[in-house]
Amino acid sequence: GDISRNEDYLAYGSDVLAVADGTVASVESALRDEPPQQAPTDIGLAQLGGNSVILDIGGGNYVFLAHLIPGSATVMAGDKVVRGQVLGRLGNSGNTTEPHLHLHVSRAPLPLSGDNVPYVIDRFAFVGSVDADSHFVAGPNAGARTLELPLEGAVIDFPAAP
């Protein structure tokens, strides 16, 4: 598709799901999507994550899911959510040059602050990777993975829930 249109990116508009049961700590949903392939120059520190949802998953841990489409959040602060529940739709808001999901776990209920917490994904399929020239490279050793965290540049797929 046209790399200058957010809507032409495969991930754009995809459902963003809760990765664990928890309570919504905060929601930002009013920031604009940025044009793809252009680094934004007019956003402040508070807008770096763009539209986002922060989940309190207990034990002092918070999940930050960022770069959602404006107005797409389906939850509000204080809502209880369950793993797999739709939180919003993937967009290109904040400090980003193309639609993608920013996800991290930290010990603070604020965007991009606090100590990061290591985590693993319970199951996914490793498909390949993206090389330095942004080309897809299949495998090697493509297939199912459990309790791992994909490396940077990995292309993965999530199988349907059993």
Residues covered by each model-derived region:
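Zn2+-dependent peptidoglycan hydrolase active-site motif and core
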Residues: 23-69
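A structural signal for short beta-strand/turn segments enriched in small hydrophobics and glycine
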Residues: 22-24, 78-90
